[in-house]
Swiss-Prot record:
Domain notes: ValRS has two distinct active sites: one for aminoacylation and one for editing. The misactivated threonine is translocated from the active site to the editing site. The C-terminal coiled-coil domain is crucial for aminoacylation activity.
EC primary class: ligase
Gene: valS
Gene3D superfamilies: HUPs, Isoleucyl-tRNA Synthetase, Domain 1, Valyl-tRNA synthetase, C-terminal domain, Valyl/Leucyl/Isoleucyl-tRNA synthetase, editing domain
Entry similarity comment: Belongs to the class-I aminoacyl-tRNA synthetase family. ValS type 1 subfamily.
Quaternary structure and interacting proteins, as annotated: Monomer.
Enzyme Commission code: 6.1.1.9
Keyword entries, A-Z: Aminoacyl-tRNA synthetase, ATP-binding, Coiled coil, Cytoplasm, Ligase, Nucleotide-binding, Protein biosynthesis
Listed GO biological process terms: valyl-tRNA aminoacylation
Protein name: Valine--tRNA ligase
Species annotation: Halalkalibacterium halodurans (strain ATCC BAA-125 / DSM 18197 / FERM 7344 / JCM 9153 / C-125) (Bacillus halodurans)
Compartment(s) where it occurs, according to its Swiss-Prot or TrEMBL record: Cytoplasm
Position of sequence motif 'KMSKS' region: 525-529
Amino acid sequence: MTKQDQEMPTKYHPQDIESKWYEYWIEGKFFEATSDETKKPYTIVIPPPNVTGKLHLGHAWDTALQDILSRLKRMQGYDTLWLPGMDHAGIATQAKVEAKLREEGKSRYDLGREAFVEKTWEWKEEYADFIRQQWAKLGLSLDYSRERFTLDEGLSKAVREVFVKLYEKGLIYRGEYIINWDPVTKTALSDIEVIYKDVQGYFYHMKYPLADGDGAIEVATTRPETMLGDTAVAVHPEDERYQHLIGKMVKLPITGREIPIVADDYVDMEFGSGAVKITPAHDPNDFEIGNRHNLPRILVMNEDGTMNEKAGQYEGMDRFECRKQIVKDLQEQGVLFKIEEHVHSVGHSERSGAVVEPYLSTQWFVKMKPLAEQAIELQTTENKVNFVPDRFEKTYLRWMENIRDWCISRQLWWGHRIPAWYHKETGEVYVGHEAPQDIDNWKQDEDVLDTWFSSALWPFSTMGWPDEEAPDYKRYYSTDALVTGYDIIFFWVSRMIFQGLEFTGQPPFKDVLIHGLVRDAEGQKMSKSLGNGVDPMEVIDKYGADALRFFLATGSSPGNDLRFYWEKVESTWNFGNKIWNASRFALMNMDGMSYDEIDLTGEKSIADQWILTRLQETIETVTRLIDAYEFGEVGRHLYNFIWDDLCDWYIEMAKLPLYGEDEVAKKTTRSVLAYVLDQTMRLLHPLMPFITEEIWQHLPHEGESITVASWPVKSEEFTFEQAMGDMELLKDIIRSVRNTRAELNVPMSKEIELHIQAKNEDVLTQLERGKHYIEKFCNPSTLVMGTAIEKPEKSMSNVLSGVELYLPLAGLLDLEEEIARLEKEENKLEKEVERVQKKLSNQGFLAKAPEKVIEEERKKEADYLEKRAAVRARIKELKG
């Protein structure tokens, strides 16, 4: 699809080029891993997005970084696999489908399990297509021939294998335990699916009367509705206040049920009254105390958060309505004697927002300690997972060291059905890859597995495991890098590591690059409730994918959050526009040059040598920084090289030979320009793939696509140290003269007299080599250069490294008029200095004004003083 013979469009319109190139790349199969044994493999698996809707800016950021790595490695000659896929997202997807059914006046129970799951598969297909369209608009170089879904048969086989193996090792068990229960979605939640928020609540202080009528014992709770399930009161065995009561019974208010006073070391004697009500079915700590003392477990709530038959007169009431009523009843009985305001941390469901209920339930669990221990041990070996930035390794280890057993069963229909069956008569439990042969005598467990159970197997289940001879598993596992946000280190990263170690004997990835969250311009997290979210597709429609990608890749340092600014995306579009215009100019002056005509052997100008050297430095720096995941620095170096060195300096200097009469110099400059643009497009390609492909196809080139063009390698042949020194001196001189012209309002078209005093003969030789550039870009009527030049009268001077510049002012401006103008400016600044200093010496102002306001005044003072000094120096210079 070469476009070398076609002229580039005048204007840069990303929308005109982006979709066509993605189609071209897909049709050309440039992104497909080749399994070429002569190449070293490089593998990344995409963190699979949920099939619940649109991708957000966080997805765009995450995938942009992965695409940079994938495109780089592909160009470096690796057999690169970037494996795409999606997550079934059990609870999230089921909630979406149920909401859609409610709009039709139906529930999942109206459909039945099989029909509901079928309906959810239809949802998945619709949204999977939508996600692929978004991936395409982002320009992601994914190998779609290997796309996976967490409910694919291959992945389901891996899930069953892992469940069965862990069960056989005693690492998966079924037990009654206090779990986090979401009464809205009616399912268990793992600890990390619970969001804790500080809530204004109350401590309710009650007195439980002793059964023998001899006094009462004081307890307190934030959840008085749970008292209906109390089965004991606990005190510390060494608490002298209560030692005589241990073993006695108290009468539970309202119910009249008698419960014992037990002694347990868990109780904090210093907190409250030192006596604690024990509700084993509704609190994890009480559950443990109950186990130690063989206490009964009385569950007083239904799964939907209403009170059950064990709650007696409160049966059927919502838990919070019950709380209000029970408080009222306890007050009437004289049992509740104090209500104290209390801010405490309350768990909420990440998915529904409901207050989570600690709830006694029979669930499936993974015994975590043995699995966590080997993951912790890994980090002491050479084979450790490298966290970038490394501070996140401590976060990861701290969580692993304090890990609790993982509740993996979910009361849902969408997901991996737990491969366990119960015998209808004997109750025997059977766990296996397939159902028992006499299936009529068995009933399968109704629950599905936590979504993160299958996600934890993603790096190897997608490669064909448990078939360890599967070609992709043998070649591409383990993977090289994982890119993900710090918010799912616990949910996902840690679980992939311990499952990878347990089932493959090696970590699932070498490096983990951690990025932060995308926030709005004020630093707030983007959310639906705040209405501050930004759709990446909207950004692409306005500015193009390249602008968004460059902004996302370069807008933050590793591990930190990224603030989204529309203005910054616009500035990256401007960067693309600058590249477009520079490339268009270059192509217009290449006179139809072919790739074979590029000849870099001829004599090169200072500018040619300098840009070639700067290119080599940029190649070395950019390659090193990408390998170190320093994408922000990559962007900064590329931006500076392209905008400043290539566009603002070299292309301007290249116009001298291009518009000149020397055909040999013209041909060399064309060759240098073609070569530098080609190499620059390759360097920029991983960050801005569309514009670089478009420009590269117009340039003299060989090969089908820049996506598979070789990555630039630093060449000592094109490193010219002398030209670097010459060019820096020339740039300093040209900049200085331009700045002075601007200060004096002398246009570039007006000739000036320029005297340059060189520090020594070496510097003078440099000046002689670059004289034609000084003449072109400073526009002097007279240029005097030497090592013993006297400063002309009434001249401006500027001291630079190695030289001093003198600009005689006679004829350039009316000296008397300019001095008068500057003296007027000096008087104005003097008044501002007096005003601000008077304010800063006012003790009343300093005592009352906010620190920020005082700091602003101090900055003003420094600014005015600096400007006044500059004006005074200029007046002195003009007066001679």
